[in-house]
From Swiss-Prot:
Signal peptide: 1-33
Phosphothreonine PTM sites in chain numbering: T539, T636, T700
UniProt keyword list: ATP-binding, Cell membrane, Glycoprotein, Leucine-rich repeat, Membrane, Nucleotide-binding, Phosphoprotein, Receptor, Repeat, Signal, Transmembrane, Transmembrane helix
Family: Belongs to the protein kinase superfamily. Ser/Thr protein kinase family.
TM spans (from-to): 459-479
Record-given protein name: Probably inactive leucine-rich repeat receptor-like protein kinase IMK2
Length: 836
């Protein structure tokens, strides 16, 4: 202290430093208070927002509807609080540069006053419920870089003025309700690299300026109504386009060659359009391409050999086109391929052995083509293969045991000469007692030793001998025909004498001897009269195989056609019990049930059932095995759904019978596309073990109700579940045996409806009719989901389904006309009189 008194200047120095420290602390405290006063957590440069920006934000708030209270911070306080406390607002030097309010539940509209935010760079309001139009004033914002308005309810057209934003880089207006054409001016921004306008209702052509943009790396226009040809993609130098998605539109014409010259392309999808012509071979020169989808078009020609050069390709989907020719042998060069879908084309030749070299492949679908030969053994080495389908080809031979154990029978159906894929379709045992069939090697050796040139005399003698043999064969055939005709005339004379008794017998059945073949033929009613010999000597054509047996189309000698089902041996009940059950089935008559006309018991235990022949085949083939040019309108689909429902309701209410195996394959269609339920009651003819196998097969095809895993018994409610699956099949065009994204058909439909994308459920063909039948489609979908409710008690009765379908679409005079039999005839009166 004494020292300080001695040095007064030291006192002044200490006082000065103390005051300076206090002033610095005060300034720091003041700055911190201003910066943190709003409590909004946003950084702020300390400059107050301009009055124009403040008024614009107030106008924006006024037109938005704040359902969740997120805009409470946008109060009427001074403009000094905007940048530091208002939710979703970011500023720079007193100017609003970003509005970020995604997933906030905001409704209302976007004010045109947003154009007053002259420094706005980013507008992010996606995943809300905002309606109205896209503000035209966005085109005034010269600093705008990103617009994210996807997943809202915006309508109207895309403003042309957006092309006036020179710095715009990302424009995403997807998943709205926008209409009109795509403005060609959008690509006037020299920095636009990402454009997403998918899932709207845009129409008109794809602007040439968009296709020829020098800056776009991502272009997604899927699920719109765009039409016309795809313009040439200008290629002169380096173009950065990596992703192109144009699927689910109405583009026509050929795939432009110039598109396949964008060397940086990684993903191309142009599925579900109307493209034609062939695939350009230049598409095989894209070194970075990972996914290529040309499915559901009318593309023809062959798969280019150049595709084997796509070394980065992971997924190739060419489903539902008109491609022909073989699969290139060098396909195994696609080392990264995990999915190959060539379903529903006209591709022929053998399945290449080289596919077995693609070790990473997970999904392989070659169904509904013209492949021949055996299934290559090399496919058993594909350890990652989880989805495999070669059904409905012309394959032959045994299925490799590894594949038959790993995949169910639906993967191999429709190949008549294929065997070993299920217990009901075993391969025949090898025959060790061959007839005189020489192998190529053994037949050539003797010819080398005994070969000599035939003389003219030898040739004449051989020709005369052959002619005599042919004449002798013709005489034998004529003699057999005369004998058969006389026998038939005698039988007809006998029938004429007893015709009155036959008519009075009605559906009770009339038995006749088996003729020369033996056995017993029992007729119910029907338009045709034939003998056992006529039936057994008819020209037969296999229509399909099932757990019950093999179905044939039989053409009788007089040209009439019937359907014959040969039941599998050792699966049916004893003769006495069998006849009692089959006689009861022969009495059932309804316009939507396939009528049993006769049955035959052979001398060796064979059992044949005779039905009306349905010219249009099964509903499954009608829906899934047609070409893209064959359209099925909603009127026809609803007619089929009503017919199935009526037939099932009659079985439940009038016959007290459960079908137990209702599938689209068991719904047959006549010439007028009337539905006839087949295979009802056949389980009553089977042993208990065989009937259980039938129900298990129905489950593998996706028609089995979930409660089967516990109760193991069929009921009227399990039939209604199967009916619901078939109605979903009619609505979606999808087969229930083909899982979508790992979900079965009801789960997939429910997931789409839950996301409020209900229109995505319906078959693309039906979407063209939505303006006239949109309500019918939605109401039928609700009914189908009711039928497939996991709880049996929640499902309606079959007769309730009939009533609701008739309420959804009342009958017209045309729809009420029915065709009694597949081939017409007198039987129409019988069916009409027996209808209840």
């Amino acid at each position: 202290m004494n020292h300080l008194y001695k040095n007064p200047f030291r006192i002044y120095e200490i006082s000065f430093h103390f005051c300076a420290s206090l002033l610095l602390c005060f300034l720091l405290f003041s700055a911190q208070a201003v910066a943190g006063g709003g409590g909004g957590g946003h950084s702020w440069d300390g400059i107050v927002v301009t009055q124009a920006n403040y008024q614009a934000l107030q106008a924006i708030k006024h037109e938005l509807i704040d359902f969740t209270g997120v805009l409470k911070s946008w109060n009427n306080s001074a403009s000094s609080q905007v940048c530091s406390g208002w939710a979703g607002i970011k500023c720079l030097r007193g100017q609003v540069v970003a509005i970020q309010l995604p997933w906030k539940g905001l409704g209302g509209t976007i004010s045109e006053k947003i154009g007053q935010l002259g420094s706005l760079r980013k507008l992010s309001l996606h995943n809300n419920v905002i309606a109205g139009s896209v503000p035209r004033s966005l085109g005034y914002l010269k600093s705008l870089r990103g617009v994210y308005l996807f997943n809202n309810r915006l309508s109207g057209s895309i403003p042309v003025s957006l092309g006036n934003c020179p710095l715009l880089q990302n424009l995403d207006l997807s998943s709205n309700q926008l209409t009109g054409a795509i403005p060609p001016s959008l690509t006037e921004s020299t920095r636009l690299y990402r454009l997403n306008l998918s899932f709207n209702s845009l129409s008109g052509p794809l602007p040439v300026s968009v296709a020829r943009s020098y800056t776009l790396t991502f272009l997604d226009l899927q699920h719109n109504n765009l039409s016309g040809s795809i313009p040439d993609f200008f290629v002169n130098g380096s173009h950065p386009l990596k992703t192109l998605n144009l699927d689910h539109n109405r583009f026509s014409g050929a795939v432009p060659v110039s598109l396949c010259k964008h060397s940086l392309l990684e993903e191309v999808s142009i599925s579900h359009n109307q493209l034609s012509g062939s695939i350009p071979r230049e598409c095989g020169g894209l070194p970075h391409l990972q996914s290529l989808d040309f499915s559901y078009n009318s593309i023809n020609g062959t798969i280019p050999d150049s595709f084997s050069n796509l070394s980065s390709l992971v997924s190739l989907n060419l489903e539902s086109n008109h491609l022909k020719g073989p699969i290139p042998d060098a396909i195994d060069r696609l080392h990264n391929l995990t999915e190959l879908n060539l379903k529903r084309n006209k591709i022929n030749g053998p399945i290449p052995e080289t596919i077995g070299n693609i070790s990473g492949i997970k999904k392989l679908d070659l169904s509904e083509n013209n492949f021949t030969g055996p299934i290559p053994l090399s496919l058993v080495h594909l350890a990652k293969l989880s989805s495999f389908n070669v059904s409905y080809n012309t394959l032959s031979g045994p299925v490799p045991p590894v594949l038959s154990k790993k995949f169910n029978s639906s993967s191999f159906l429709g190949n008549i000469q294929l065997c070993g894929y299920s217990s009901s379709n075993p391969c025949p045992a090898p025959d060790h007692h061959h007839p005189l069939t020489l192998s190529p090697t053994s037949s050539q050796e003797p010819r080398k030793h005994h070969h000599r040139k035939l003389s003219v005399k030898d040739v004449i003698l051989i020709a005369i001998g052959a002619l005599l043999a042919i004449l002798l064969l013709l005489c034998c055939i004529l003699l057999c025909c005369l004998i058969k005709k006389r026998a038939a005339l005698k039988q007809k004379d006998g029938k004429d004498k007893t015709s009155e008794k036959t008519v009075s017998a009605g559906v009770a059945g009339t038995a006749s001897a088996g003729g020369e073949m033996g056995g017993k033929l029992v007729h119910f009613d029907g338009p045709f009269v034939f003998t056992a010999d006529d039936l057994l000597c008819a020209t037969a054509e296999i229509m399909g195989k099932s757990t019950y047996g093999t179905a044939y189309k039989a053409t009788l000698e007089d040209g009439n056609e019937v359907a014959v089902k040969r039941l599998r041996e050792k699966t049916t009940k004893g003769v006495k019990e069998f006849e009692g059950e089959v006689t009861a089935l022969g009495k059932i008559r309804h316009q939507n049930l396939l009528a049993l006309r006769a049955y035959y018991l052979g001398p060796k235990g064979e059992k044949l059932l005779v039905f009306d022949y349905m010219s249009k085949g099964s509903l499954s083939a009608f829906l899934h095995a047609r070409g893209p040019e064959t359209l099925i309108p909603w009127e026809t689909r609803m007619k089929i759904a009503k017919g199935i429902s009526r037939g099932l309701a009659h079985l439940h209410s009038n016959e007290n019978m459960i079908h137990e195996n209702l599938t689209a394959s068991n719904i047959l269609l006549d010439e007028q596309t009337n539905a006839h339920i087949a295979d009802y009651g056949l389980s009553r003819l089977m042993t208990a073990a065989a009937a259980t196998n039938v129900i298990a097969t129905a489950g593998t095809l996706g028609y089995r109700a979930p409660e089967f895993s516990k109760i193991k018994n069929a009921s009227a409610k399990t039939d209604v579940y199967s009916l619901g699956i078939i109605i979903l099949e009619l609505l979606t065009g999808k087969s229930p045996g083909e899982p979508t994204n790992g979900m079965d058909l009801p789960q997939w439909v429910a997931s789409i409806v839950k996301e409020e994308w209900t229109n995505e459920v319906f078959d693309l063909e039906l979407m063209r009719e939505t303006q006239s039948v949109g309500d019918e489609l939605l109401n039928t979908l609700k009914l189908a989901l009711h039928c497939v409710d996991p709880s049996p008690a929640a499902r309606p009765e079959a007769n309730q389904v009939v009533e609701q379908l008739e309420e959804i679409r009342p009958e017209t005079e045309v729809e009420t006309e029915t065709t009694p039999f597949g081939s017409g005839g007198e039987g129409g009166k019988d069916l009409g009189s027996n209808e209840e």
